[in-house]
Amino acid sequence: MGYSDSGFVFTNRAPGGEDPLQALQDERLRFDQQQVFLLNQRADQVAENGRTELSLVYFAGITASPDENYDSGQAEELEGLMVAQQVALQGSGPVVKVIVANGGSKMREAVPVARMIIALAARNPGLLGVVGLDRSIEQVKQAIGLFNASEIPVVATTLSADGIGGTYPHNDHYYFQLSPSNITEAGLILRYIQEIVPRYFRQSRNEYYSAGQIQARRILIFQPSADPGDLFTSTLVSDLKREAPLFKGLPAPQVTQQLGTQLCGAATVDIYAGRHDRPSAGISQLDDFSEFLRIIEDDCHSADKPFIIADDGVSRFIADPAARDQSGLGEPEISYVTNGIALLNTGSRCLHTAAAAAAQGSGEPFSSFCTTYAAIVQKLFNLPKVQGYGLDFLWTGERVGLAFDAADLFIDAETNFQSSHPAIGRAEIPGQFISDPWQGVTGLIDFTTDLHIASLPLAVVRIRISSPTATPTCEYPGQGQVFGPGPGTGRCPDGSD
């Protein structure tokens, strides 16, 4: 744990070697950190010629213990920060350095590392804030409180637990959150069950067998862990239970931590309310979400399959073709929540330089973001393979855009403030953030309300797990629409593609 802005790269060193896919992610994280540090050097060089330079801390759980796996989320965020650094260097305004801070496995060391960052900020007035934060857990909540007390701005990319940054009117003045809170996600899931699930139940039994029912007869919330310190899962489950009676026609949700036949049932909706962490050593080699899918495949016969909806905690699993291609998961179509619908709707455009250049030429949104990220992706695709495995992306990960927007908020704040003042300080950042809504690549970011939650758009989308080349379809935005214009192509139950 600790922080680094050059030289030292955080990586795993598992005794006896790692799974090839894990080793591949290690290589990706190592490459990303090295690229960030090279861009830091370039920022220093142009700052010597008079450009304003600001620093941000990227704070996440970058390493994992030997018994745990981690996925591409942290790499995606580092790559989003790289895009922000490069776009800034190509312009004429402020440039940005990124200090990488590691909170350890699952952010368990968030508090001591936060104290290190606070000490660093006391010595470095050009350090304007912290982005990332990785997990809605008790240690991260404590770290946010420490940053707030030290007047260090924080922009959390994916945190969503209710009250993670305090509760109104006592919410933390220096805390800002891009993702909607869990109460919003719970409402979207429940409205999806009320409005959209019946459309699937009305389809032929070849599409989904509901035993002749057109509404959910049972809602089961599967919560892999009841750890009260995991604020993401605990508040989401509480929200689902509390809000369900407000949705006419829905049965009262039941909560279980047990895997088995109780998950089965035609016209049963299983809500996966968890992450996709790997359990303690010796229990299973599968992550929690994969084990959930495997049990349903093994224990539920074809006329007894539940309708599956997963929270946004599985979005990184979905985005990893290798994870979806594991044996034993069956061929289920599942619905899941994404807070990256704006990027999902770009498809593969931002992954390939020719497509990104065409987007830039036509003046479409995301132009500079797309072209810069596409060049980074080509370097990632060229990384050495590990036992035949190479990196493969089908669309731009939502965390790439979230991290880019988080950094760009600080860059724009510096730019706007400098137009009529000297260089900005940390104390002025909140005032800049709340002054006006701001258009990011992930959507409209509006911190003008008292809660400092941008509430970027959530959507429920659908995907077939069995195919490593499948992409999400049938966007349900839950804003008075049945299905939105994207992403992808696929038959939706109202007949739209």
Predicted features, each with a name:
Residues 1-58, 93-96, 108, 126, ...:
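Extended repeat-based interaction scaffolds and adjacent low-complexity, acidic/S/T/P-biased segments
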Residues 72-76, 91-167, 452:
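Beta-alpha junction/loop-to-helix N-cap segments that form part of ligand/metal-binding clefts
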Residues 46-48, 78-98:
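Signal peptide-proximal N-terminal region
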Residues 121-135, 151-158, 218-223, 254-262, ...:
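Periplasmic-binding protein-like
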Residues 67-79, 227-235:
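Glycine- and acidic-residue-enriched helix-capping/strand-helix junction motifs
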Residues 183, 298-404:
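Extracellular/periplasmic periplasmic-binding protein-like sensory domains
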Residues 380-478, 486, 491:
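Segments of small-molecule ligand-sensing domains
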Residues 171-257, 292, 353-362:
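An alpha-beta-alpha
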